Amino acid sequence: MRFLNNKHREKGLKAEEEACGFLKSLGFEMVERNFFSQFGEIDIIALKKGVLHFIEVKSGENFDPIYAITPSKLKKMIKTIRCYLSQKDPNSDFCIDALIVKNGKFELLENITF
């Protein structure tokens, strides 16, 4: 696991906090934040219409943040999701989403693995 400096971590936490507000405005219910497993972390777990959404929040100003979600990152997310589901509710319907924060604007990309 890579350790972030405090400034970078604070920026990420601020983006996640703003992301939660945005998601709530879209009708999502926050279930959990920063779920860790031995494989990685899920930034936000939210529920909408009976479906669990595992959401990776990415922010950036000088680049397109979606490119920070690499195939390797997705594999780690999937392993972490499996851990979460095995602990909480193995029969849940779910999807993997990305929430992009750029220049103060939000874009929710649903089902990024398809």
From Swiss-Prot:
GO terms for molecular function: nucleic acid binding. It holds the Pfam family UPF0102. It comes from the Bacteria. InterPro entries: Restrct_endonuc-II-like, tRNA_endonuc-like_dom_sf, UPF0102_YraN-like. HAMAP family: UPF0102. PANTHER family: UPF0102 PROTEIN YRAN (PTHR34039:SF1). NCBIfam families: PRK12497.2-4. Belongs to the UPF0102 family. This is UPF0102 protein HP_0823. The lineage of its organism: Bacteria, Pseudomonadati, Campylobacterota, Epsilonproteobacteria, Campylobacterales.
